[in-house]
Structures are given as structure tokens and as C-alpha cells.
């Protein structure tokens, strides 16, 4: 994954975990980032030109800083599927955005599994996870690709493409960076984990001098006017029953401690009516 801005390459992120099972046999041709013998490559070697030569950071431990905006890191395809992915150390070192450049083929049920992976990762790392996979034009006689792309923040899917992407397209969404930062400040367990394991991998911080402002009017982000009430009837009924049974459990525990019988004066108001329903419910 090459990170470039205005003709300058700021870093190259290398894949760490190579799949070598089922239809994949990447270790036949490629090596892991763990086997790198250098932490940089010169632009002249990469571009074949001596006109502008400089050292480009190379590895799986790069975090990019955009002044007064956000930090991001990148990982490649199979890295997401690992028990401890490179993105875990990137997030604990400050990256609010994780980008995944992937070539994940389609099989029965795999799309749904990828969705669960990305949602879970954006939840546990308290980040926004941007996932982009190879499109339909990359399909061969052996593998089918659909161009599956997702933008997920804190376990919530902000944007996702249709089933098969045959043409080039952009997937966009408004991301709440300040919410991510606030959640991390509030989440003491996250801070403890970062303090314990964040230094396990030495991350390299790279500044990208971007002058453009990253602002939005929020029109690309849908806001649910009823965040605690599911729109789907079945889910709403389940939510209400969950609340109802929690209240029953709390009242039953209190009565078991106090002993004796329950006496309710039913006035017709909400409190006494609900109390009567809680007691009547087996």
C-alpha cells in the first residue's frame, strides 16, 4: 500500500500475513513484512529515475499524520483475518483510521463474514475501518472478485457497495473523528491496553504536510432520530421484551432479599401498571 501526496511517496506498507491455504498459496511467490531486511527503499530504485531520490519508509509499522485532522494506518487483505493484526498496534499508537487494501475473493457466505470482521475490528479498536477489495474485472477462471468495499465506524456500517462492482466508483461517508477520540479517552480499558501492549511494536510516525481542510457539512452521514428504537418491528419487539425481562429480574432479586409479599396500589398510572405486569409475568 503506497501512500503518496502531490507526487511525493511518504511510505509503503507491506503485507504481514500471507494466506497459504485452500485456494491461496501466496508464500510460493511472496515474503512477509517480518522478513524485510531494510526499513526503507529509495525512490530511484522504485521509480527508475535519479532526478528525485529520497528514502521511502517501508514496513508494516507506519502511521501517517495529517496536521489538525487525523492519523491513519494501512494493512493488506489477510492481515485483517489474523488474531492480532498490524492494525491493533496502529490503533493503540494513535491511528483513528485503518485502511485495508484487499483482494478477497467471493465464496458462499464470505461477504457476510467480511462484514462481521470489519464491524468487530472497528468496535474493538475504536476506529473507522475502510475496506476496499478487488473489483469484478480482476476475476479469473479460478477466483471471483466483487469489489466489496465498506466504511465502518465503531461497529456501525456507514457505507457499503452493492453486490457486484463492475465499474470504477467512489464510496464516501462522513466520519466522526472527534467521536473516536472521545470514546478512546473515555474507554479506560482501551488506554490500559495501549499502555500495556502499544509499545510491543515500534511504530514509525510520518507527517504528511496536507494544507487542505478536511471538513464536511455532515450530509453524507445519516442520523437516526430514534437511536434507541429499532425501526424493524421484529427487532423493536425483541428490544422491548429484553427491557421487560431485565426489569422482572431486578424486581425479583429485590423481593428475594426483602422477603414477604408484594402489595401494589394500582392507580392506572404507568408505574403501577408496569409493576403489576412484572409480577404477573412468569
Question: What are these regions, as identified by a protein language model?
Answer:
Residues 1-265, 273-282:
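Enzyme catalytic cores with a strong preference for nitrogen-chemistry domains
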Residues 269:
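Conserved G/P- and acidic residue-centered "switch" motifs that form tight phosphate/ATP-binding loops
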Amino acid at each position: 500500500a503506497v501512500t503518496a501526496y502531490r507526487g511525493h511517496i511518504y511510505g509503503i506498507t507491506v503485507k504481514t500475513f500471507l494466506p497459504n491455504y485452500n485456494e491461496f498459496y501466496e508464500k510460493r511467490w511472496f515474503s512477509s513484512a517480518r522478513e524485510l531486511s531494510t526499513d526503507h527503499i529509495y525512490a530511484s530504485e522504485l521509480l527508475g529515475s535519479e532526478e528525485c531520490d529520497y528514502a521511502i519508509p517501508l514496513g508494516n509499522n507506519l502511521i501517517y499524520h495529517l496536521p489538525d485532522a487525523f492519523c491513519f494506518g494501512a494493512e493488506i487483505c489477510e492481515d485483517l483475518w489474523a488474531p492480532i493484526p498490524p492494525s491493533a498496534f496502529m490503533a493503540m499508537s494513535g491511528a483513528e483510521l485503518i485502511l485495508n487494501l484487499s483482494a478477497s475473493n467471493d465464496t458462499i457466505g464470505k461477504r457476510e463474514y467480511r462484514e462481521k470482521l470489519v464491524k468487530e475490528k472497528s468496535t474493538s479498536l475504536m476506529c473507522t475501518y475502510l475496506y476496499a477489495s478487488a473489483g469484478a474485472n480482476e476475476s479469473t477462471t479460478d477466483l471471483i472478485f466483487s469489489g466489496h468495499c465498506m466504511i465502518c465506524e465503531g461497529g456501525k456500517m456507514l457505507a457499503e457497495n452493492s453486490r457486484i462492482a463492475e465499474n470504477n466508483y467512489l464510496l464516501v461517508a462522513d466520519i466522526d473523528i472527534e467521536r473516536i477520540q472521545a470514546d478512546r479517552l473515555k474507554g479506560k480499558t482501551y488506554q490500559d491496553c495501549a499502555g500495556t501492549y502499544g509499545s510491543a511494536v515500534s511504530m514509525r510516525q510520518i507527517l504528511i504536510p496536507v494544507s487542505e481542510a478536511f471538513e464536511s457539512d455532515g450530509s453524507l452521514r445519516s442520523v437516526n432520530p430514534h437511536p434507541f428504537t429499532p425501526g424493524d418491528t421484529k427487532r423493536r419487539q425483541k428490544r422491548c421484551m429484553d427491557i421487560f425481562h431485565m426489569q422482572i429480574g431486578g424486581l425479583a432479586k429485590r423481593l428475594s432479599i426483602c422477603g414477604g409479599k408484594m402489595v401494589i396500589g394500582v392507580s392506572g398510572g404507568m408505574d403501577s401498571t408496569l409493576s403489576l405486569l412484572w409480577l404477573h409475568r412468569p
